[in-house]
From Swiss-Prot:
UniProt name for this protein: Protein U58
Pfam families linked: DUF587, Herpes_UL87
Family matches, as InterPro entries: Herpes_UL87_C, Herpes_UL87_N
Organism lineage string: Viruses, Duplodnaviria, Heunggongvirae, Peploviricota, Herviviricetes
Superkingdom of the organism of origin: Viruses
Record family assignment: Belongs to the herpesviridae UL87 family.
Gene: U58
Amino acid sequence: MQHTGNCETLIVNSCFGSTCARSIPVFIDSCDLTAEVSRDEETRLARSVPVVLEKIESIIEKIFQTSGPNIVHDKDRAKIALCRLLLGPVAVPCFCEEWDTNDYLSKSGCKCLGPILYIHTSRCRCSDIPVFKFSIMKDYYASHVFRGLLSLKEWNTHLPNVLCTCELSMSDRYVATVFPKQNSIYLEYYPYFLCYLCRYLTVIEIEQCTNDLISLLGPKVAQRVIIHFKLLFGFRHKPHMGTVDSWFWENFFMLELHKLWLTVVKHNRVTTDFFNVVYEKIQNYKQYAIKTLRMSSKAVPAIQRFCLAKFKQQLLYLNIKVTVKKNKRELCLNGFVYGKTLYVVESSQLIFRNLLLLYYDYSLPDECKTKEENVLTTHYIRVISRLSFKQSRSAVPPGVKPDFTFVAQLPKRKELPNVPGGIDFAEITSVRHGAVILNAFNTNKVMNLKATISKRANFVYHRIPKTMTHSFVMYKHTFKEPAFTVSTFVSNDDLDMSSLNINIRGPYCDFLYALGVYKMHVSIQDLFLPAFVCNSNNSVDLQGLEDQDVVRNRKKKVYWITNFPCMISNANKVNVGWFKAGTGIIPRVSGKDLQNVLLQELNNVREIPGLVFDMDLHQLLVLLEQRNLHQIPFLVKQFLIFLRLGLLMGYGNSRRNKVHDIMLHLISNGLFDFNKNSVANTKIKHGCALVGTRLANNVPKIIARQKKMKLDHMGRNANSLAVLRFIVKSGEHKNKTVFIKLLEYLAETSTAINTRNEVARLLLTLTTNMKT
């Protein structure tokens, strides 16, 4: 803390704020400086050394500090440190007098036939700190070496150079990042470096970074990178308690288990028992637990102790995805065997596979134990390919500047999904083909999900038939508010859990509300989301069609025509039913599959010859649908259509755009908004249950020729031509002049031949009736 007058200023020094590392070229004037001492250095690097965790952590922190001031995120620092470790240790030999040595020079006594540096201290204007002047010598003893990590030149632009830059005429893309001699790096330290890196990077990110480095530097450097990558993930021997302090492994794995514990949505006796047993195994049998937790995905262990009922509950509460197969002794990843059954978990949940093995007391037989590869000194020297800078430079195409910098970027904010619960729970699904938009509305969904039974004491076992071998519907509940139906499936091999089949309409919030209502009435302890949408029915209206009959009278893409007034087409192996007035139904699909079906069907509809859209009316009706997230009722649509038609006749066709702007303004301000819970336009039992059967049957009707007729007799989506045709043919028109003007306007403005012919027939009927 620094005092300034009466004020106190707290100065905190960041561990990444400054660095003691320096940069030095490894290739000068066509000379590879590392070639002569590489074998001796590799022998030194691979020998066994005492492991002091505090020293190792100090070294890796200094490697982190070399990232530079522009790198502000720890993940980016970790990636640069990882790349330096993957390129591995390197040494640059030199000769200097004793009075010129410093903390970066370590003693060495090997004779070098090739080039070495002769250095001496000098002050130069190119640097604010003392640097070395140098010259190249051959066939001379190297008195000292600079030791550090191989790096790329662009990573070290911010680091001070050991040599005077005035004398550096040219240099390679590779440089060495050297550290003080008390921070020497040995291969024994590599696995401990990984433990530090894993604080900021996942294993997948480490592998991805390794692949990116190999693809950048080319195949000639790949072998060097791969051997150091293997060193990160492998100990030379099983860790001894004398070498590795017990708290190191204990704290490391405990920290990871605490992270998993925090990801569990709900904690109860099942999750508590699971993690308590795992913690106990790690505490009491550390070596056994570490071996089990590090088990490869290729291993398929067999366990002897297993409880299926408890296992099913663990899968639900820990959200583990498991596939059950027969054990056919085939190659299978991420699995384990119990009896004749193979249980396979998802690749992203391999840690849970190993934790389950630990929970169920899995022990690897001696004859099946995997022999850990021992990284011997001779093996390391034989495998690692010394980096020949003359050859490796050719891996980069000429004229292409290599770029492997980590640019510090602000983390992107993850956008929330537009539809709560995902696209499968969307009330409206829209697709576009050119200027035509098709909106599909969900009429009902059927979903499956798992639940656990809370009161086993109230469950009567003898009610389940002894001969039952499959699940069946034990209970069925129908609710009015919110309107939904739940079927409960119970199986005789599982008395703790049940499967629910829910039939409901509405958004995801209504679904969650329905689950809460259901839980209040039955003995359910927990419901497990997400639910799986197994069936979904949707309805569509083609808006703005001048002649709606052409959709059902088409000849192409027709799959089946039923006796019922419905034409069946097929799109993406889904049957789409088309009724009168351009109304269609799409069963079974939801989400992306529904979008694909809509696009295919809309494309088929656009290919119908003689199909004409009134695009202004189409835009208005689509906007009203999207505003209310519901199909437009018959009365609302007719009010909008004939109001617009009257305005067009009053203003004249020349001011059509003015009328369109007026209608857009009225729709945007909610003049045509309607109640979505209207039962007059639905046949869904859930909706009828809201108001009761008698009131639900009270659909608005009109009297035509002394006969009651439902308003949607012509179809909910009927256009003006269909309504006028019905009125003219029924003869229930008192003021024929109004209808003649409407029909004449339609004939004048329509571009569809079928529409003009139909209007001409209707006008002929009206004029004939007027004469008679």
